[in-house]
A protein has these predicted regions:
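Glycine-rich phosphate/adenylate-binding loop
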Residues: 1-90, 206-213, 217-384
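Glycine-rich adenosine-cofactor-binding loop
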Residues: 110-153
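Generic structural signal for helix capping and beta-alpha/helix-loop junctions
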Residues: 153-154, 197-200, 248-250, 273
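Generic beta-strand/beta-sheet core signal
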Residues: 123, 147-149, 191, 216-217, ...
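A short, basic/flexible loop-to-alpha-helix module at the beginning of a structural domain
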Residues: 92-120
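A structured beta-alpha segment of the ubiquitous adenosine-cofactor-binding alpha/beta core
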Residues: 176-212, 217-221
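Beta1-alpha1 glycine-rich phosphate/pyrophosphate-binding loop at the start
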Residues: 32-46, 133, 148-161
């Protein structure tokens, strides 16, 4: 390969550098390396093995005792590690522990050894689900089940974490690539269908009791009722993040098993308490024929504000059994929370009048058990 070397103020070549994981640096079986060269910095970023198919071919790695190539980039095994060269000149190598380096900035805030054991089952991988997945990946969650039947289209891009290069693929596949780009060690299972049809063996493999949370992101009450019931079966928590017209407001509901909480079906399954957009009508994120409705889709910043509050609750719930963890919101928000982006009727209509001011987050709403439950969730009483 040919490269352009960066120069300093005096026109001198800036030293070239290789970034590579400790695992790869000491891999004596390595024969080729893939990644990317950045000509503005003079850095060769050797991609982890799990992402090698996304990188450009950088060069070969030769056996111990070999003479470095006089032309281009190569590596030579020396004792128990690879030394890198550019046209025969040895290059500075900076190795890193992949997991430790990626999550080093979380130290003291989140315990990475705790977070890597957690699993998130994300139902709906659109604008909400994609943000949830990306932030949990950054927080160190290492196990995912992604469930969505939709294909990423161009009208999704302005509100989705994936981009134009992903258009045409299933949302679950596109999102899996994004997660692995943050943590190549993540274990991500995908299902290109609705939660009601997901094979049980996928969840049996991935869901660990009290270490798993199901996240309803599809604005579909039927799916949320079903997902909460499955979560209870696996002794897993459940949270739903949904939106009202134009995403001027949203609602967040969570259920933690064996905490004497009403499940989603009891609390919100009928839809009587909320102005949330009903099942399968993704008006806030995916509506294509905008002129056929009375309001417009919500913009990304409104969707993300409410979703971020839900993500904080997810992280709190996943760490609720960790004695050293300090909750951000869980001790202050009720099981059912409303969040508004604006209190202007010109955007939200008459329903917006229930909010006193913009960015209001409720802390006093209470939901109860349904008529089929006498003070305890009937789903939790069912035999597994």
């Amino acid at each position: 390969m040919e490269i352009k070397r960066p120069k300093n103020f005096f026109g001198e070549d800036i030293p070239l550098t290789v970034f590579i994981s400790e695992e790869q640096l000491h891999n004596k079986e390595c024969i080729k390396v893939y990644g990317k060269y950045f000509e503005d910095t003079g850095i060769f970023n050797v991609f982890p093995n799990e992402l090698s198919d996304r990188g450009e071919y950088l060069g070969d790695v030769f056996p111990e005792g070999s003479t470095p190539s006089a032309n281009g980039f190569c590596g030579v095994i020396n004792n128990d590690e690879i030394e890198f060269y550019w046209s025969g000149e040895k290059i500075v190598t900076e190795s890193y522990g992949l997991y430790q380096s990626i999550f080093s900035r979380n130290k003291g805030i989140l315990e990475t050894d705790v977070m890597k054991k957690k699993c998130a089952v994300i139902i709906g991988c659109g604008s909400v689900g994609s943000l949830v997945a990306m932030e949990l990946a950054r927080a160190g969650v290492e196990k995912y089940v992604l469930c969505d039947a939709d294909t990423l289209e161009y009208h999704n891009v302005c509100r989705h974490q994936c981009g134009i290069e992903d258009v045409g693929d299933l949302k679950v596949n596109a999102l899996k690539r994004k997660i692995l780009n943050i943590n190549p060690k993540a274990n991500v299972k995908t299902f290109g269908g609705i939660i009601q049809n997901i094979p049980k063996e996928i969840l049996d493999e991935m869901c660990t009791p009290y270490e798993t949370i199901f996240v309803g992101c599809g604005d579909n009450r039927t799916a949320d009722v079903y997902a909460n019931k499955i979560a209870i079966y696996f002794d897993a928590a459940f949270i739903s993040i949904g939106f009202w017209e134009r995403a001027y407001a949203g609602e967040i509901f969570y259920h933690i098993p064996h905490k004497n909480m009403p499940c989603y079906k009891c609390a919100l399954g009928s839809g009587d308490l909320s102005g949330r957009v009903e099942a399968n009508h993704h008006i806030y994120s995916n509506q294509e024929d905008v002129e056929s409705v009375k309001f417009e889709p919500g913009i990304s910043v409104d969707i993300n504000f409410i979703t971020s509050i839900g993500i904080k609750l997810i992280i709190d719930i996943l760490n609720s059994t960790n004695e050293g963890y300090i909750p951000r919101l869980l001790n202050n928000l009720k099981q059912y929370t409303l969040v508004c982006n604006t209190s202007d009727p010109a955007i939200g209509g008459e329903m917006v009048e229930i909010f006193s001011y913009p960015l209001q987050v409720t802390t006093s709403l209470v939901v109860g058990f349904g008529k089929d439950c006498s003070g305890e969730c009937s789903y939790e009483l069912e035999e597994k």
